């Protein structure tokens, strides 16, 4: 009987989704994405950056990004390097000039030597708030603008159509654009490790090599032939604040992105459903939210997490220390951040 009830509930959820409203429309009065007062960490700091109250180091690109990260409480050790041209500033990115990414629980920073700085700052109601600005020259103050172009990649199917977090895994070709794509329209810790990290550098002795990182490719006779691109062989580590692109921040970013996008979809759906129902949620929409709730619980419990190597994974101790620095302990001394 329970199996029949579960099947009926799931069928109702799928039916509801098929007949669904456009829950993700940012212009909807339910969301007011572009006009609602913002409550994300970076927005609250903008005035301080633009007036110089929050001082930044303009000595070099490396010094600038390091000082910005310090203000945002984003650890330098979270650095990930991506050499595929799979983001907004494609003309700057290559194996000779990788794009660096840094993150904590609420703010995500993109830095390309010679390019613009990109920010995703999470608003609890609206999701990702996107900013982009030039790296100021010495003596100048930053002019920070909210970006709408980022939504072209950060509010699509793989982000559950809400302003969320986007991750891709590709094989870059000779011009650093994608010639092969993996895990299409999927983000989260359920993705097999063998399908992850394409277009990124992975440093350190992680203990396994069955992933798509550190590879470039070319098409030969209709097939993609790949070869290893060792980190640091085409660029100088000294222009970045750290000399790592470690496996642990890779894994945590994947897990975190899947969680954030799932929570934001539930938030957007619930708000949209309440709006069209004038404060009420009808049974059809309730079934959708119930299905999402069950998916969220499974995600929180790591029920469908991809299998790890039997011997575990070796990680950068510096990032471990930085990640655990703000852990909040329960009464028994353990924390959800414990690794």
Predicted segments with their positions:
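Boundary at the C-terminal end of the N-terminal hydrophobic targeting segment
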Residues: 16-18
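Generic detector of well-ordered alpha-helical segments enriched in charged/polar residues
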Residues: 43, 62-70, 249, 290-301, ...
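N-terminal alpha-helical interaction blocks
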Residues: 20-114
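Sequence context surrounding c-type heme c attachment/ligation sites in exported
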Residues: 20, 109-318
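Acidic/aromatic/glycine-rich contiguous surface patches that form carbohydrate-binding/processing clefts
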Residues: 307-339
């Amino acid at each position: 009987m329970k199996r029949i009830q579960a099947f009926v509930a799931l069928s109702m959820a799928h039916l509801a989704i098929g007949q669904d409203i456009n829950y993700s429309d940012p212009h909807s009065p339910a969301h007011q994405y572009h006009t609602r007062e913002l409550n994300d960490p970076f927005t609250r700091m903008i005035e301080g950056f633009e007036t110089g109250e929050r001082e930044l180091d303009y000595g070099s690109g490396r010094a600038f990004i390091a000082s910005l990260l310090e203000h945002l409480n984003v650890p330098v050790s979270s650095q990930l390097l991506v050499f595929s041209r799979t983001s907004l500033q494609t003309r700057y990115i290559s194996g000779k000039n990788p794009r660096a990414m840094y993150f904590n629980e609420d703010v995500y920073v993109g830095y390309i030597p010679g390019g613009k700085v990109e920010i995703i700052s999470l608003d609890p109601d609206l999701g990702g708030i996107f900013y982009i600005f030039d790296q100021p020259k010495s003596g100048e103050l930053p002019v920070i603008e909210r970006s709408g172009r980022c939504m072209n990649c950060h509010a699509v199917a793989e982000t559950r159509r809400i302003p969320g977090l986007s991750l891709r895994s590709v094989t870059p070709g000779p011009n650093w654009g994608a010639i092969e794509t993996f895990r299409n329209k999927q983000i989260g810790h359920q993705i097999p490790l063998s399908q992850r990290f394409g277009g990124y550098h992975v440093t350190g002795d992680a203990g396994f090599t069955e992933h798509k990182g550190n590879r470039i490719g070319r098409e030969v006779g209709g097939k993609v032939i790949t070869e290893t691109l060792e980190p640091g062989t085409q660029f100088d580590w000294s222009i970045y604040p750290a000399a790592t692109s470690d496996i642990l921040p890779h894994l945590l970013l994947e897990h975190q992105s899947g969680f954030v996008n799932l929570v934001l979809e539930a938030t957007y759906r619930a708000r949209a459903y309440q709006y069209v129902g004038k404060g009420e949620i009808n049974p059809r929409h309730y079934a959708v939210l119930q299905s999402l709730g069950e998916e969220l619980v499974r995600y929180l419990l790591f029920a469908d997490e991809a299998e790890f190597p039997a011997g575990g994974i070796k990680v950068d101790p510096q990032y471990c220390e930085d990640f655990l620095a703000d852990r909040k302990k329960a009464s028994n001394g353990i924390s959800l951040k414990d690794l």
